[in-house]
Regions:
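N-terminal nucleotide/polyanion-binding subdomain common to many enzyme families
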Residues: 4-90
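Short glycine-rich anion-binding loops that position phosphate/pyrophosphate groups of nucleotides
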Residues: 47-50, 171-176, 198
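Structural motif
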Residues: 68, 111, 165-166, 191
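Conserved beta-alpha
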Residues: 76-158, 162
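Short gly/pro/ser/thr-enriched loop/turn and capping motifs at secondary-structure boundaries
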Residues: 76-78, 175, 198-203
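Short Gly/Thr/Asp-enriched flexible loops that form oxyanion-binding sites at enzyme active sites
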Residues: 126, 177-186
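Short, flexible loop segments at boundaries between secondary-structure elements
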Residues: 143-147, 188-206
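Proline-aspartate-enriched helix->loop->beta-strand connector
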Residues: 163-173, 189
Length: 206
């Protein structure tokens, strides 16, 4: 389709390969993910994450394996040498993908499940979502305190029992890559959205 041709480029930043799509194309892809029958991963990528990935091979692998990468800061575009006059800069500055994605979830009546590293983070993220996107349906949430397999299993069961469509993860770094890499085949949700180290959202939420 025409939208797919608007992909800006395959980028390489600090040795990490990323595909960069304009928001219209990224939204088309996300809508497709909601209708297929497997768990697809979408990640918001920041400079901090890329710097971490340049030092940690598993984290680099996680970012490169994401089904859809969404650039979360204009600094990433700058590092990739993308012209500041391109529309991508405004899309990134205004977090346009995030906004359109969540409004889309309200329209499709999709259920989300929120993950956080601490109870405070979890509540902050849930509060941010309900206040920013009135009508969004949060089926549940959980704090991921441990990487033990038994804890993962009970969490996967909880996510699946809520008939979750989208998992919104505020988890830091290696916690979430381990969780997704090891459990994706067991999770019945459609999309894993990793907010990562997305400072703008965290600041707005805080």
């Amino acid at each position: 389709t025409e939208a797919y041709r608007t992909m800006n480029a395959e980028l390489e930043i600090l040795g990490v390969k990323l595909k960069h799509y304009r928001v219209d194309a990224a939204m088309e892809i996300a809508e497709e993910y909601l209708s297929n029958d497997k768990l697809n991963t979408i990640g918001i990528v920041t400079m901090q994450m890329l710097m971490q990935a340049s030092k940690e091979p598993t984290w680099k692998q996680y970012i490169e394996d994401l089904d859809l990468t969404v650039i979360g800061e204009t600094e990433v575009l700058e590092a990739a040498g993308i012209d500041p006059e391109t529309p991508s800069y405004e899309e990134v500055e205004t977090n346009e993908f995030i906004a359109r994605f969540f409004w889309g979830l309200i329209q499709t009546k999709s259920r989300i499940f929120v993950l956080g590293d601490t109870e405070e983070e979890l509540q902050t993220l849930q509060k941010y979502l309900t206040e920013t996107y009135p009508g969004i349906e949060i089926g549940g949430g959980a704090v991921v305190e441990t990487l033990e397999e038994s804890a993962f299993d009970s969490l996967v069961n909880e996510i699946n029992s809520q008939t979750t469509d989208v998992i919104v993860s505020g988890l830091a770094g290696t916690r979430q890559d381990r969780f997704v890499l090891e459990n994706s085949s067991k999770i019945s949700a459609k999309i894993w959205l990793s907010l990562g180290e997305h400072s703008t959202l965290q600041n707005e939420a805080g």
